[in-house]
Amino acid sequence: MKKVNYFGTGRRKSAVARVILTNGTGKITINTRDFEKYLPLPATRLEMIQPLELTEKREAFDVSVNVNGGGLSAQAGAIRLGIARALIESVPELRAILKKAGLLTRDARCVERKKYGLKKARRAPQFSKR
């Protein structure tokens, strides 16, 4: 059987994930490491494979991911979006299912910048009345 690659890019906070789906057996590698070793927390692993579980394609594709930037939670979110986008490229009919579950929405929340005159983004220095 001919190997067919499907690509998807996901971003979350400062993490960027480039995902390649290949017809296979369900093997997932992140930065050339097994995904169980790369993501030690079960919650982040479940978040990452959510699109595959929802569409019942867990065993249909091998997933290869190159991810950098951000922490493990942000990377899991970026991978999730990348997998969802790659799944749509492979099977366009899955778009409705993924859209309804909210897996195609880029989470735009990121760290608010620090302003001058303040200690943090919104924390003002202590005020003394006298």
Swiss-Prot record:
GO cellular component: cytosolic small ribosomal subunit
Any GO BP: translation
Keywords: Ribonucleoprotein, Ribosomal protein
InterPro entries cross-referenced by the UniProt entry: Ribosomal_Su5_D2-typ_SF, Ribosomal_uS9, Ribosomal_uS9_bac/plastid, Ribosomal_uS9_CS, Ribsml_uS5_D2-typ_fold_subgr
Ribosomal protein found in the keyword field: yes
SUPFAM superfamilies listed in its UniProt record: Ribosomal protein S5 domain 2-like
GO molecular function annotation: RNA binding; structural constituent of ribosome
Domain of life: Bacteria
Pfam family, one: Ribosomal_S9
Claim: Repeat is one of the keywords in the record: no
Family the entry assigns: Belongs to the universal ribosomal protein uS9 family.
UniProt-recorded name of the protein: Small ribosomal subunit protein uS9
UniProt organism field: Onion yellows phytoplasma (strain OY-M)
